[in-house]
Amino acid sequence: MGNWLTGNWSSDRSSGYSSGWSPGGSSGVPSGPVHKLEKSIQANLTPNENCLKQIAVSSVPSQKLEGYIQENLKPNRESLKQIDQAVDAIWDLLRSQIPVKEVAKGGSYGRETALRGCSDGTLVLFMDCFQQFQDQIKYQDAYLDVIELWLKIHEKKSVKHEHALVVQVSVPGQRILLQLLPVFNPLRSNENPSSCVYVDLKKSMDQVRASPGEFSDCFTTLQQRFFKKYPQRLKDLILLVKHWYEQCQEKWKTPPPQPLLYALELLTVYAWEQGCQAEDFDMAQGVRTVLRLIQRPTELCVYWTVNYNFEDETVRNILLHQLRSQRPVILDPTDPTNNVGKDDGFWELLTEEAMAWLYSPSLNTESPAPYWDVLPMPLFVTPSHLLNKFIKDFLQPNKLFLKQIKEAVDIICSFLKNVCFLNSDTKVLKTVKGGSTAKGTALKRGSDADIVVFLSSLESYDSLKTNRSQFVQEIQKQLEEFVQAQEWEVTFEISKWKAPRVLSFTLKSKTLNESVEFDVLPAYDALGQLRSDFTLRPEAYKDLIELCASQDIKEGEFSICFTELQRNFIQTRPTKLKSLLRLIKHWYKQYERKMKPKASLPPKYALELLTVYAWEQGSGTDDFDIAEGFRTVLDLVIKYRQLCIFWTVNYNFEEEYMRKFLLTQIQKKRPVILDPADPTGDVGGGDRWCWHLLAEEAKEWLSSPCFQVEQKGLVQPWKVPVMQTPGSCGGQIYPTVGGVTK
């Protein structure tokens, strides 16, 4: 068992750990947070610990960070076990004397983010006699006096600090400054709290005029649960960030507020959730991401909806008030009234220190130095009048990025045309740049470069289906041999398919500041050379439709053959519509990332087409209100069960074979969204994908500040029909759809 030493920062003794806590140590724990005790601790550190204090973590090479954490920052497991036993002994003593129903462990100790050496912790005592938040205000001090008295009777020393008693739990190699906090327990079960808990919290705070976050300790159980679900490696990253923060404090004359430490822990969790979510990640990459976020305090707005959300009006108003307040905002995920990131004048100092480490040689041992793509604030809290700025600042790639992408694409296209099939009978007919980069809708750091390579040996849809996997393998083989003679680094993604349709890889080069992800797809040249005044060969579609009728072909299986048409359909659109497309894609990606468990969502291309349709039908102008466009697309997603959308720009109802096929397509189960380049491609898919999940997310977003305009109320969607018919597209055909003649 460990020593329970109060107010005494003497070195550990070799005896007295067998049972309970040894009395001893001078009275009077220093009243400030842990960082105020650093000088006292320093004098009693072992030589190795003293050495650690002198080594700036910012000087540790990136490849050695993991070893640094394991060797210097992580507490010893046996020490933590002894700490647990000592804390449990405190709990056993107190519950035998006072009406404590249960306890929760908080602070760094409870969150399992305690640093080796000295750290903070709390033992929250849920008092059986506290029936409401107000009781905590009325009776907390009285119970602290009772607890202090019982501790003295048992020769256990403590110091009263604000609304807590502070004791030191000490074992060899580890000390915890433990606050004892008698509080009200608003959670009557182990389940997630209902909105009533937070409505009651707001009501009680108003009655007693409590400060924001004053009752946050009541939610320690939730805080413990919140951190428990995260992988150990993320907690190791938190230790690294906290250790850096402690070293920063030593340079500052005035100690920062204790909540800032918790804010950095939450910011680290946010960075990992938004940018990684993998249990095995590069530690330096995580550090760079956190430091980049710290550099942007005036934009930081971080929150979670795991314990509270926007459904209840009272809770929604609390949240919106917080999210509209001055940045930085980092909300406690267990208490919406508690902004632990509030700026008390220290963020500027922290920003300077973050910049110094971020651009230090030790953290830039490779070029480019990778980091996760994480925004400092979510789209949800962006006011409607700032959406254009959000797109420009966070989503739209700069000219340098686009130049880098172009250079990378040119490198691969040159390889495909001039090297890959040099000694083969197969010839490259053409390479076509596809995907968001070619369409002009690429996201900053979040878009792939697609290259479709049309090969002479692929002479039909059938030959493409049969032979494309061998061409994928051949391209990979040739590329692997070629890069050995170049200053490139290529990492191939292992396909989950036995017969892969695409070669996916990441390209790094000394000439590129960013690594670029590629998808290379072999294709059959069904269209030949396109010209703007050229009417498409009807054979291309006729052959495709006949093949689909005779064989079990998945819808859109050969859409890759029509990449040029897909690209041109978007590429020619106004710049502002492309901005709206970026916004919708970002919204989609954010939901895709947070969705648990994972499900099969509709393809992003479906959302792109839905966005174009909304603009065509609702605006059609080069200059429109982004918030209205965004709101309209979400409205269409919510109405997915009614959607029937198609275009007649590349095919129409004139030819008999096409007319019959299209009439069959548009009478399928909703939603129906036909690819304007490929009539066999229904990216709406009926019930093939989980549209209902996307619709639920869209409904939640209707309460977002994105759609609130002061004085004018809510942003209204454009008036857009959810269903098209051949007649509405000028086809002079009025079929029966859903039992109604259109």
From Swiss-Prot:
Pfam families: NTP_transf_2, OAS1_C, SMODS. InterPro entries: 2-5-oligoAdlate_synth_1_dom2/C, 2-5OAS_C_CS, 2-5OAS_N_CS, NT_2-5OAS_ClassI-CCAase, NT_sf, Polymerase_NTP_transf_dom. Residues 10-21 have a biased composition (Low complexity). Its cofactor is Mg(2+). Residues 382-721 are annotated as: OAS domain 2. The modification N6-acetyllysine is found at K417. One of its GO terms (cellular component) is perinuclear region of cytoplasm. Myristoylation is not essential for its activity. The keyword Cell membrane does not apply. Residues 1-35 are annotated as: Disordered. ATP binds at S436, R582, K585. GO terms for molecular function: 2'-5'-oligoadenylate synthetase activity; ATP binding; double-stranded RNA binding; metal ion binding. It comes from the Eukaryota. Changing Q232R: In strain: C3H/He. Disulfide bonds: none annotated. Residues 60-374 are annotated as: OAS domain 1. It is found in: Cytoplasm; Cytoplasm, Perinuclear region. SUPFAM superfamilies: Nucleotidyltransferase (SSF81301), PAP/OAS1 substrate-binding domain (SSF81631). Produced as a latent enzyme which is activated by double stranded RNA (dsRNA) generated during the course of viral infection. The dsRNA activator must be at least 15 nucleotides long, and no modification of the 2'-hydroxyl group is tolerated. ssRNA or dsDNA do not act as activators. Strongly inhibited by copper, iron and zinc ions. Partially inhibited by cobalt and nickel ions. A lipid is attached at G2 (N-myristoyl glycine). Its main location: cytoplasm. Belongs to the 2-5A synthase family. Interferon-induced, dsRNA-activated antiviral enzyme which plays a critical role in cellular innate antiviral response. Activated by detection of double stranded RNA (dsRNA): polymerizes higher oligomers of 2'-5'-oligoadenylates (2-5A) from ATP which then bind to the inactive monomeric form of ribonuclease L (RNASEL) leading to its dimerization and subsequent activation. Activation of RNASEL leads to degradation of cellular as well as viral RNA, resulting in the inhibition of protein synthesis, thus terminating viral replication. Homodimer. This is 2'-5'-oligoadenylate synthase 2. It comes from Mus musculus (Mouse). The lineage of its organism: Eukaryota, Metazoa, Chordata, Craniata, Vertebrata. The gene is Oas2.
